[in-house]
Swiss-Prot record:
Signal peptide from the UniProt entry: none
Disulfide bonds: none
SUPFAM superfamilies the UniProt entry points to: Putative methyltransferase TM0872, insert domain, S-adenosyl-L-methionine-dependent methyltransferases
Reactions it catalyzes: cytidine(1402) in 16S rRNA + S-adenosyl-L-methionine = N(4)-methylcytidine(1402) in 16S rRNA + S-adenosyl-L-homocysteine + H(+)
Protein name: Ribosomal RNA small subunit methyltransferase H
Gene: rsmH
Annotated source species: Tremblaya princeps
GO biological process: rRNA base methylation
């Protein structure tokens, strides 16, 4: 397997759509390898600030010597509470990248890859108590079948779900390769089917729909009026999650969606299916915190 260094996606598009005030406060809710934070700091003035967060405890933050940067480990579903505890209010923008990094995928012990063996874990946030194997032990056939179907699984979803549950529950030792084989069965499009299945399983392991709904629901309380929330998705399920979350959110409107340039797709394979959703806060949410001037 060729190891590919992770490269943040649509960096310039994020800056162009997020940065409205060079002295503003911006939150990178999924720091990863720091591409978006680095670009934002490069465009901010001396009074600007970037708060970088990531739920992955193994992440090491750059820019620690930059007085305009602050960092911490937190899941973006906890964004509102994290900032409240830090007495930070009135952000000009938030960006969240919903895809896993290549660094995480290539770490076999995380179990995120269907190309080499690893434990059936898939937790991006290690503070989550239950790995995927534990979740599958108590997941019903109908639930897994529905998740596979929602993620565009191209095979017989119920049969694949049944094989996955059987091998996880009955085998004495099971790896991610066994799960990939169970998902694909005898189908000749195995690689694509395994990718779809692993997206569904990763979403389940990390409660991704619930995390996104929490982010969208609480973002208006964090943002200033007119502030932006940018969300990067990488498949049709992610796009549907964003749109469904917006329907139930107060004071957020979708301004536009932005696709990567062909040049970026050609040079950064991770951008191929990406889409940037640009949301703007309007009005005053009932749960909004009072605006504070940062010291």
């Amino acid at each position: 397997m060729v190891r590919r260094e992770h490269r943040s996606v649509m960096i310039q598009e994020v800056v162009d759509n997020l940065l409205t005030n060079t002295s503003g406060l911006y939150i990178d809710a999924t720091y990863g390898t720091g591409g978006h934070s680095t670009a934002l700091l490069g465009c901010l003035g001396p009074q600007g600030k970037v708060i970088a967060l990531d739920c992955d405890q193994s992440i090491r933050f750059d820019h620690t010597s930059d007085p305009r940067a602050a960092a911490g480990h937190a899941n973006f579903r906890e964004l509102s509470g994290y900032l409240r505890c830090a007495e930070i209010y009135g952000a000009d923008g938030i960006v969240a990248d919903l895809g896993p990094s290549a660094t995480q995928v290539h770490d076999a012990q995380r179990g995120l890859s269907y190309l080499h063996p690893g434990p059936i874990d898939m937790r991006v946030d290690p503070t989550l108590r239950v790995p995927l194997s534990g979740r599958l032990m108590r997941t019903g056939l109908g639930t897994l079948h529905s998740s596979l179907r929602c993620h565009g699984f191209s095979g017989r979803t119920k049969a694949a779900a049944s094989r996955i549950l059987h091998i996880v529950r009955k085998a004495r030792y099971t790896t991610t390769l066994d799960v990939a084989t169970a998902a694909c069965g005898l189908h000749n499009q195995g690689k694509h089917m395994a990718a779809d299945a692993f997206r569904a399983l990763r979403s389940m392991a990390n409660s991704e729909p619930q995390c996104l709904r929490s982010l969208v629901r609480h973002a208006p309380a964090v943002l200033k009026p007119g502030g932006r929330l940018l969300i990067l998705t990488f498949d049709s399920f992610g796009e549907r999650m964003v749109r469904a979350s917006i329907e139930h959110a107060s004071c957020l409107v979708l301004m536009r969606t932005v696709a990567p340039t062909q040049r970026e797709v050609d040079t950064n394979p991770g951008a191929r299916s990406s889409l940037l959703h640009v949301l703007r806060r309007t009005g005053n949410p009932r749960s909004a915190a009072p605006q504070h001037t940062r010291p």
